[in-house]
Amino acid sequence: WIMGHMVNKKYQVDEFADLGANAIEFDVTFDSNYKADYTYHKVPCDCGRTCGRYEVFTEFLSYVKNETTPGHPSFREKLVLLQLDLKMSYLTESQSNEAGKDMAKKFLNYYWNRGSNGGRAYILLSIPSIDNYLFLTGFKQQLKTEGFEQYLDKVGVDFSGNEDLDSIVNVLGRLEDEHVWQSDGITNCWTRGISRLQDAIKRRDEDESRYGIKKVYTWTVDYYPSIRYYLRLGIDGVMTNFPNRVEYILNEEEFPGSLRMATIDDNPWEKYVG
């Protein structure tokens, strides 16, 4: 998965898709009532990017619905994954639960269109901390309450705060969620060691538990040598400000036999066996 980073404006969806992204990541903030309000990343953000651009969340969601709905004039076939970077680390457990319920309602109304020709992309909920795990519980509960449990097949979870992997695995067991991605990374302004990333990859490959890690990705990787390096480690996704660079490298002689861009037919909740 080539994951376009910080795609918080409508026009950037097209910009990053044109550069080769088959997934986009956007930031989501919450108001004082724990309801999703904007696609916004405050200062600081990645080097070389402009912080602070935003859209009203529901308007942005409607826009990407059109981009991922077959038959719509704006449909982009290659755009198959939406990742939400949830800016909610300050919320309590009960507040996280309420935020999850609100998010499910917004997806039903503005993305899935309550079953009437809505968007088809997979959804990855990136939760900043295991302390906010009840967000996922609230999200699932709301879908079930409203009779749209089938959409759970499209939704996965990622705990994105670089926390202890054993602690994350324990929470995943309590959540009983099989659609698990695991991230590791840092802003492109800095470098980061790879020991935790390698541990996540090892767990993905060796852990056969039902609620184990299925995919591993790293962020934010922009430079050609770094992209090649991480691909060689065996990651499933690269979050980047330059999707065209990842696409270019995937077509180099080293990788075409083992790696390719994911399509809608590739299940993001299953381990890849190359």
Swiss-Prot record:
Plastid in keyword set: no
Highest taxon listed in the record's lineage: Eukaryota
EC number in record: 4.6.1.-
Cofactor entry: Mg(2+)
Annotated S-S bridges: C45-C51, C47-C189
Cellular component GO terms, alphabetical: extracellular region
Subcellular localization, as worded in the UniProt entry: Secreted
Gene Ontology biological-process entries: killing of cells of another organism; lipid catabolic process
Reactions performed catalytically: an N-(acyl)-sphingosylphosphocholine = an N-(acyl)-sphingosyl-1,3-cyclic phosphate + choline; an N-(acyl)-sphingosylphosphoethanolamine = an N-(acyl)-sphingosyl-1,3-cyclic phosphate + ethanolamine; a 1-acyl-sn-glycero-3-phosphocholine = a 1-acyl-sn-glycero-2,3-cyclic phosphate + choline; a 1-acyl-sn-glycero-3-phosphoethanolamine = a 1-acyl-sn-glycero-2,3-cyclic phosphate + ethanolamine
One MF annotation (Gene Ontology) recorded for this entry: metal ion binding
Main enzyme class: lyase
InterPro entries with a match to the protein in the record: PLC-like_Pdiesterase_TIM-brl (IPR017946)
Active site (record annotation): H5, H41
Organ and tissue specificity: Expressed by the venom gland.
Co-factor: note: Binds 1 Mg(2+) ion per subunit.
Residues engaged in binding Mg(2+): E25, D27, D85
Record's keyword terms, sorted: Cytolysis, Dermonecrotic toxin, Disulfide bond, Hemolysis, Lipid degradation, Lipid metabolism, Lyase, Magnesium, Metal-binding, Secreted, Toxin
Tagged with keyword Disulfide bond: yes
Family membership noted in the UniProt record: Belongs to the arthropod phospholipase D family. Class II subfamily.
Entry function: Dermonecrotic toxins cleave the phosphodiester linkage between the phosphate and headgroup of certain phospholipids (sphingolipid and lysolipid substrates), forming an alcohol (often choline) and a cyclic phosphate. This toxin acts on sphingomyelin (SM). It may also act on ceramide phosphoethanolamine (CPE), lysophosphatidylcholine (LPC) and lysophosphatidylethanolamine (LPE), but not on lysophosphatidylserine (LPS), and lysophosphatidylglycerol (LPG). It acts by transphosphatidylation, releasing exclusively cyclic phosphate products as second products.
Protein name, per record: Dermonecrotic toxin LspiSicTox-betaIII2
Lineage of the species this protein comes from: Eukaryota, Metazoa, Ecdysozoa, Arthropoda, Chelicerata
